[in-house]
């Protein structure tokens, strides 16, 4: 299966994968096995796969590709207080806003404390990260309409598909998939662009911390 075919199949599988299914055998296991990846356990991540033939410790630099974002197929909201569908411009603003927040949190975590050097060119010691946000679902998009207030239990949910490749050969090194829903306090909260962005940033920062921790551990293991 070529790379494009794998991604298309992954997207299809993810669109039908529920939270409960993440804990059981699912099509993603077979797809990743097809790519020569073995399933591994990563605390805080639903699914993780790694190539047994590649030592991540060999990499000292990273390329972080621009974050891609796709909405969940059944997400078709109306403007708050109206029966009008959300405009294409509003949808694009949400998509680019989420991409920007995730990109910022990943690069901030990776660079923190002089950790990993993020570069733009491929090299023998460069690992390419390709982050994608899939199945983005925003419960109450804020279109800043006067006199309209919306309350929700959660801001929404999104799924991370992060793949790591050797920057020169293009060989896949690792793949992780994780679905996250924003915090649910059990109380109705006023929804706004500020709260939506804040919840997105919280989830992205969590993913970024786990990524940084795993990369640091791999690098440390390679020095022993």
PLM feature segments, named:
Residues 1-11:
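Bacterial N-terminal signal peptides that target proteins for export
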Residues 9-19:
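Bacterial N-terminal signal peptides
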Residues 24-50, 157, 168-175, 182-224:
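C-terminal/domain-edge helix-coil "capping" segments
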Residues 24-66, 70-73, 108, 112:
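N-terminal secretory signal peptides
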Residues 48, 61-70, 126-134, 161-163, ...:
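Soluble periplasmic/extracytoplasmic beta-strand elements of cell-envelope proteins
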Residues 59-128:
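N-terminal segment of the mature soluble domain
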Residues 108, 112-171, 182-191:
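Surface-exposed short loop/turn segments
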């Amino acid at each position: 299966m070529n790379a494009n075919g794998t991604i298309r199949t992954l997207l299809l599988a993810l669109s039908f994968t529920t939270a409960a299914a993440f804990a059981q055998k699912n099509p993603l296991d077979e797809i990743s096995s097809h790519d020569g990846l073995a399933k591994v356990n990563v605390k805080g991540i639903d699914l993780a796969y790694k190539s047994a033939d590649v030592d991540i410790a060999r990499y000292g630099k990273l390329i972080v590709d621009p974050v891609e974002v796709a909405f969940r197929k059944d997400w078709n909201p109306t403007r708050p207080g109206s029966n009008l569908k959300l405009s294409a411009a509003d949808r694009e603003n949400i998509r680019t806003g989420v991409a920007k927040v995730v990109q910022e949190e990943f690069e901030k975590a990776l660079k923190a404390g002089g950790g990993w050097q993020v570069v733009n060119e491929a090299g023998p010691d460069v690992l390419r990260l390709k982050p994608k946000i899939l199945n983005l679902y925003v419960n109450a998009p804020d279109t800043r309409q006067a006199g309209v207030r919306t309350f929700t239990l959660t801001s929404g949910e999104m799924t991370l598909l992060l793949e790591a490749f050797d920057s020169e050969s293009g060989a896949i090194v690792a793949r992780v998939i994780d679905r996250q829903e924003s915090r649910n306090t059990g109380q109705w909260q006023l929804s706004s662009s500020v709260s939506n962005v804040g919840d997105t940033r919280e989830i992205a920062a969590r993913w970024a911390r786990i990524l940084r921790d795993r990369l640091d551990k791999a690098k440390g293991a390679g020095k022993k």
